[in-house]
Amino acid sequence: MIRILPSMKQLSLYNDQLMPALGLGTWKSQKGEVYTAIRQAIAIGYRHFDCAPIYGNEKEIGTALHDALLAGDVTRKELWITSKVWNTHHRAEDVIVALKRTLADVQLGYLDLYLIHWPAAHLKTVKIPKTKEDLISLQQLPLEETWQGMEECVLAGLTRHIGVSNFSTKKIKGIQASAKIKIAVNQVEAHPYFQQKELLAYCQQQHIALTAYAPLGAYERASLMPNHSLPFLSDSPIIQRIADQHDATVAQVLLAWGIQRGTAVIPKSTNPDRLLQNYQAADLSLSTEDMDMLARLDSGYRYERGSYITLEGSPYTAKNLWDE
């Protein structure tokens, strides 16, 4: 019997505003599938949707949101819509231009959260860098300038909150030193193989919510890894054992773990059954023993390396991009 959660767990932001702890990611959601997935997700109970112009599907998402609002399936106030400024629009005056384009595509008057997608910039004419000449260093275009553009978006009423993505503690501190508006959220890769414990602790200390992307792992990237000897998270006997004990799926355990440790999670799916299963993960409660077992899986195993940013000759290296 399908049981829809009466209410979704929420994360409290620095200003006491609430963000749903489980959302729907839309990266790699194909055109033609996104519309149906968004409508189905809203019917299930999802209210948090994570978008970005580089994903290439914001217009279709906008159509789905428009139709859901028109049909009375949900109100705008109930929704939490996140998008991101791409690396081509990091100059202060370009940030608001990019946001206005996103708002037109998603057919909304404002976002709930707008993020700097990456702590790296490249030429406006280059969507994905191919050579070192396509990139702009942080010395040429500091993140502090981009943050000023983000703040202008808040002052213009185009987004309620602003934040960052793929930022280290060091880069967060750099923004904080001159920020007039606080960082609300840092969105980073996080799962049992890559738990980001120190970053999470710093964010929580600073009242910055952490959103985990790739909370189920990122299998499509595993073949690109120099060492991918670890089993997929879905094949981990430890996680499977915990799932069996709770009569749950492995994905539900992974999502429940993320929520229970105080992060938001944004799994991607366009499959109706998985949409429901993922949503119901927010109702799963793991024991202290479960959480301890999952904590021991931390391997420092990052799937997303930002390889197109750290290409040969780039001003960005794996070391200075991630500050590791």
What does each model-found stretch correspond to?
Residues S29-I42, R91-V106, E145, S168-I172:
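Short, acidic/polar
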Residues I2-L79, I96, L216-Y219, A318-E324:
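N-terminal binding-site loop/beta-alpha segment at the start of enzyme catalytic domains
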Residues P119-E324:
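Beta/alpha (TIM)-barrel catalytic core signal, keyed to glycine-rich beta->alpha loops juxtaposed to Asp/Glu
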